[in-house]
Amino acid sequence: MSIDIKFTINDILFNQESLQKKNKYTCPICFEFIYKKQIYQCKSGHHACKECWEKSLETKKECMTCKSVVNSYNDLSRCLMVERAFDKKECCCIYSFTEQIVQGGTNCSPPDGASDQNQRKLIKDEENGCKEKIEVDQIDSHLINCQYKFVTCSFKGCEKILRMNSLESHQNECGFKLVICDFCKRDDIKKKELETHYKTCPMVPIDCSQGCSVKIERKSIIDHIENDCCNTQIPCKYFEQGCKVEMKRSELQNHLERVNHQTYMGILIDKLTNQVGHSKKTHDELLKKIEDLSLLIIKFSDACLKKQVLPKALDICSNGYRNKWIISNYSSLAKSKLNCKSLSSPILLILSHHFQVCVYPKGDENKEYISLYLRVNNIEEPNSLKVEYSFTLVNVLDKSKSITKRVDKIVFISPKEWGWGKFLLSDLINKENGWLSNDDKLTIEIYIKILNEEYEPLES
């Protein structure tokens, strides 16, 4: 972020004393240079800045110098030649200076937040300041792009103030710059804290503390010492069987070859044999428990299934099965020449019997009517099934206009279809009449009840 230095034209203008003496480029009333001021003159050629004219004309309608009558701005003329001439005067860049806060009074206004005792002082920076000479009308554009302006470092925590042209080199070395650890890849480490981070980073390779000349990541050093380091003191592998010798890991093989461990090996074999027998016994016990649990699960599942299915089956036996079949895109299906002659519902599984509802949009015999039939798929002679059923063609605009047709008793002895060939005129089935919904769906309500068997009386 750039830091602006407050300045007046007096701070940067070349030959200002000479220009002030000529009185051509200063207002004769406020005695300020005409930088960024509009200059007006009376008919006699006496000029002053716009601000001074405004204050004067509020009280007196006359020229402040010659006292000639001036009723309003219309009596004045703009001194553009004077303004343009001043715009071409040379000055230095404010960033050719450095700014210091000093004790005691100066002619300069203190910056924001500074007291009268702590005021600013501009000091020419011959070594690092801007060397460019510019014209007055170029000041603003130059200051925007000046590479010598003061800026703050963009890294959080850094309070360094420096010139723009040295910002890049500073930020490359700034201690507050966030860098990535080469080892753990953390990307939130300040550059000045990187060396400290390396001292605790779990991924930094460090020397083994036991002098084995192997470099290991800090996080793995304990595992290395306990399991891999050749200089770690370890007991003989038959320690528990009686060999109490300890040695470096690198000496273990030599120890095993040099010392006869046959007795210890026998003890170990006996121990392992006992462990194998115990493990086999445990394994057999676990298998038996698994088998018992499996039987319990099957028994429990059957009980749950009966608990869920039985009430539903009893309800269907008593009250019958009810559902809806909603046929989407009915108009398209009815008009399509590629589709089959009839439409079949999904299978209805009712007490182990497979039912289907069949719709003939163009009729099975008479094309002027829609036909509706019921079919039982899994029945063959000599078996039979007595059924009571009904179909309701739902009118979505007026439920009272819905059409219901019912069969109180029919005996199925084969997968033959039973129902109505002339249920409703096909031309009536449209959205306007309410038989189709706005999204072209036909709804059929289904009721099916399997009737109880009738038995002949017993005689003896």
UniProtKB/Swiss-Prot annotation:
InterPro entries noted in UniProt: MATH/TRAF_dom (IPR002083), Sina-like_RING (IPR049548), TRAF-like (IPR008974), Znf_RING/FYVE/PHD (IPR013083), Znf_TRAF (IPR001293)
Keyword terms: Cytoplasm, Metal-binding, Repeat, Zinc, Zinc-finger
Keyword Zinc among record annotations: yes
Zinc finger (TRAF-type): 141-194, 196-253
Main location: cytoplasm
Domain MATH: 320-448
Molecular function per GO: zinc ion binding
Annotated compartments: Cytoplasm
SMART domains per record: MATH
Gene3D superfamilies: Apoptosis, Tumor Necrosis Factor Receptor Associated Protein 2, Chain A, Zinc/RING finger domain, C3HC4 (zinc finger)
ZnF region ranges: RING-type: 27-67
GO cellular component: cytoplasm
Coiled-coil zones: none
Domain notes per entry: The MATH/TRAF domain binds to receptor cytoplasmic domains.
Family: Belongs to the TNF receptor-associated factor family. A subfamily.
Protein's job: Probable adapter protein and signal transducer that links members of the tumor necrosis factor receptor family to different signaling pathways by association with the receptor cytoplasmic domain and kinases.
Annotated protein name in UniProt: TNF receptor-associated factor family protein DDB_G0290883
Organism from which the protein derives: Dictyostelium discoideum (Social amoeba)
